[in-house]
């Protein structure tokens, strides 16, 4: 785990996680990963990997340095695309995201969102399924949990920076039928 933290990885692509995601993607057409970071999930799933690469912005990199957190070293195979641009380019049925922060929209979002965050409500308008891997303490207050239908998997085998009991996989029903 120490090495993954030093390299900016938030979740590790365990065999169990990849198997579960492959099962969730089995009937999907053109699935993609957004917020892919180093591409650890998409690479094993053999799907396009995209990321807005905001950690390359000087002000974001400086913030991470200040809080002593590593920034991601984005590999070439990760496309530099904001999440909605990736959805427009690839027209996926399913989007996979891991530890993404939602887009800041209202004052009520403070502390749980950012101006460079993902507009998950908009993504859900364009896909059939949105799979979010995250942690209850960090992602459990997302707006989409109040506005969209979802099921939850509480996997004890997801390895992340958070305590294992809070790790979750949320599977949202998109609006694009």
Question: What kind of region is each of these model predictions?
Answer:
Residues 100-103:
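Short glycine-rich anion-binding loops that position phosphate/pyrophosphate groups of nucleotides
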Residues 28-37:
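Conserved class I S-adenosyl-L-methionine
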Residues 95-98, 132:
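Redox-cofactor binding/interface segments in oxidoreductases and associated redox assembly factors
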């Amino acid at each position: 785990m120490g090495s993954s933290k030093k390299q900016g990885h938030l979740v590790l692509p365990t065999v169990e996680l990849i198997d579960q995601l492959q099962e969730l993607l089995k009937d999907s057409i053109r699935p993609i990963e957004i917020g892919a970071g180093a591409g650890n999930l998409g690479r094993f799933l053999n799907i396009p990997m995209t990321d807005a690469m905001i950690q390359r912005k000087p002000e974001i990199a400086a913030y991470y340095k200040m809080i002593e957190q590593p920034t991601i070293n984005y590999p070439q195979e990760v496309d530099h695309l904001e999440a909605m641009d990736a959805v427009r380019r690839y027209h996926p049925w399913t989007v996979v995201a891991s530890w993404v922060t939602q887009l800041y929209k209202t004052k009520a979002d403070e502390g749980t969102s950012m101006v460079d965050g993902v507009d998950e409500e908009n993504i859900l308008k364009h896909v059939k399924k949105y799979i979010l891997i995250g942690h209850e303490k960090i992602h459990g207050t997302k707006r989409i949990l109040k506005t969209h239908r979802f099921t939850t998997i509480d996997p004890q085998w997801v390895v992340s920076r958070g305590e294992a009991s809070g790790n979750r996989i949320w599977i949202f029903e998109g609006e694009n039928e």
